[in-house]
């Protein structure tokens, strides 16, 4: 073994962290010290001496031993770190942390004497799965509901409706009420911030306002005044109003009703690019069916991924967790920016710290799911062929032909990741048992209604025919 060779002892620590205890020979320490002296003598400027011609004794006196030792140690630690990575075939996730700190190590560093230092770093974890086949998962079923077609058409009719004044009857559900109002809290009589208006349009539909407000307007006559009791929900957006009772003095100034357009071809042409009402209905039905299939598939895949993640054994490195947390916070900031908000003034250091803390559980769960899929791909040797990736890249590139600043390498990686994820989830679906569950609220809307009391479940073995799980769980939920 060379006199300057490094001896390394590796210790695995929690959270996928490695501690590398490195024994640096005395000759190596002395050589680094001498190199530091030479380097400083060439670069330092001292009065009365030409650059690079400063005598060693003068240099030591002017700079001091501590600075020279510190310079030597810095270069030594950096060189040792790079050499250890290559020698031990380690791929770190972050820069090394010197155990005990630099100052403590500097005190023990003496040229001509051996030195032991400990470097710590996070490394990519090795995820393992206790099982990959025969997993049990439960997924909520999503089926096409024909009544949604009528709901969408009615929404369009409302948007295209003509508002007609009402004078001869009281306010009713579905009307548009123009009101003035002022509100106070019942507990202390204080005015509600933002709780007054001289004129506001109120759509008299359930859920449009806080509980009690719309209900109080129903039955009022034009020009009348009424005090209405309301209750702010516990999850109301303004914290100081949550759960509090309030009273509003309401004046009904105007009342309007919607005059809906006839359901005919003219309506279809006005509300869409379809020529006839039949074409509009067929288009809406097709889109809703496709959406139901997508959501149903997404539910199954989410359930399978959750079941797979339960089989995962892994130590999450803090470096990856922090990276995922930053991604989540950046996504939140991007969403606010897209809504036109001033992100720079909104995202104070305090808010960022709070968001990072609250985002940690989600970040860890996302990491666990990603690592579970990675482990599945390795365990079952599932890959995507280059030809598949290239074909998909061409398809996506055509769709993004008008976009600028597209990084081909990043696009290819994103396409590859998506294709592999789909393949892994399809494999899971073929090798797992999914219990499909229809919630009571959805069962009531399925046909025939009389046969859909309570929750219904059906166990579907998706081992031989994947297409079977693309269908509703039971004929009773078909429409």
From Swiss-Prot:
Consists of 3 domains; the N-terminus binds the ribosome, the middle domain has PPIase activity, while the C-terminus has intrinsic chaperone activity on its own. Residues 437-479 are annotated as: Disordered. Keywords: Cell cycle, Cell division, Chaperone, Cytoplasm, Isomerase, Rotamase. This is Trigger factor. It is found in: Cytoplasm. GO terms for cellular component: cytoplasm. HAMAP family: Trigger_factor_Tig (MF_00303). Residues 467-479 have a biased composition (Basic and acidic residues). Pfam families: FKBP_C, Trigger_C, Trigger_N. Its EC number is 5.2.1.8. It comes from Prochlorococcus marinus (strain MIT 9303). GO terms for molecular function: peptidyl-prolyl cis-trans isomerase activity; protein folding chaperone; ribosome binding. Belongs to the FKBP-type PPIase family. Tig subfamily. SUPFAM superfamilies: FKBP-like, Triger factor/SurA peptide-binding domain-like, Trigger factor ribosome-binding domain. It catalyses: [protein]-peptidylproline (omega=180) = [protein]-peptidylproline (omega=0).
């Amino acid at each position: 073994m060379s006199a300057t060779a490094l001896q390394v002892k590796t210790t695995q620590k929690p959270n996928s962290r490695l501690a590398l205890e490195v024994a640096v020979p005395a000759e190596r320490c002395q050589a680094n010290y001498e190199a530091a002296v030479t380097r400083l003598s060439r670069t330092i400027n001292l009065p009365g001496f030409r650059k690079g011609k400063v005598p060693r004794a003068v240099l030591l006196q002017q700079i001091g031993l501590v600075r020279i030792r510190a310079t030597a140690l810095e270069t030594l630690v950096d060189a040792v770190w790079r050499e250890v990575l290559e020698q031990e075939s380690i791929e770190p996730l972050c820069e090394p942390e010197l155990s005990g700190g630099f100052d403590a190590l500097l005190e023990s560093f003496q040229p001509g004497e051996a030195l032991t230092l400990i470097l710590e770093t996070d490394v990519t974890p090795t995820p393992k799965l206790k099982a990959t086949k025969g997993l049990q998962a439960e997924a909520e079923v999503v089926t096409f509901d024909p009544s949604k077609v009528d709901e969408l058409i009615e929404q369009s009719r409302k948007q295209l409706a003509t508002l007609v004044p009402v004078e001869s009857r009281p306010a009713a559900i579905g009307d548009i009420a123009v009101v003035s109002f002022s509100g106070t809290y019942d507990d202390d009589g204080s005015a509600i911030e933002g709780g007054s208006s001289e004129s506001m349009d109120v759509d008299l539909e359930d859920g449009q306002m806080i509980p009690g407000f719309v209900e109080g307007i129903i039955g009022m006559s034009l020009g009348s005044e009424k005090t209405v009791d309301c209750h702010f929900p516990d999850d109301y957006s303004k914290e100081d109003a949550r759960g509090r009772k309030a009273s509003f003095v309401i004046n009904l100034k105007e009342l309007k009703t919607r005059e809906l357009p006839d359901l005919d071809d003219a309506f279809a042409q006005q509300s869409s690019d379809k020529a006839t009402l039949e074409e509009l209905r067929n288009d809406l039905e097709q889109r809703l069916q496709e959406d139901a299939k997508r959501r149903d598939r997404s539910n199954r895949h989410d359930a399978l991924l959750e079941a797979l993640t339960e089989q995962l054994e892994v130590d999450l490195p803090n470096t990856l967790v922090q990276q995922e947390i930053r991604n989540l916070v950046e996504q939140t900031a991007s969403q606010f920016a897209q809504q036109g908000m001033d992100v720079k003034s909104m995202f104070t250091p305090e808010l960022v710290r709070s968001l990072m803390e609250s985002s940690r559980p989600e970040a860890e769960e996302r990491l666990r799911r990603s690592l579970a899929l990675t482990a599945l791909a390795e365990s079952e040797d599932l890959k995507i062929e280059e030809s598949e990736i290239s074909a998909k890249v061409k398809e996506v590139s055509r769709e993004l032909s008008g976009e600028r600043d597209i990084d081909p390498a990043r696009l290819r990686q994103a396409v590859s990741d998506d294709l592999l994820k789909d393949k892994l989830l399809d494999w899971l679906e073929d090798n797992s048992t999914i219990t499909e569950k229809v919630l009571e609220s959805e069962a009531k809307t399925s046909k025939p209604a009389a046969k859909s009391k309570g929750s219904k479940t059906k166990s579907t073995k998706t081992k031989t025919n994947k297409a079977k799980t693309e269908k509703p769980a039971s004929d009773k939920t078909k429409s």
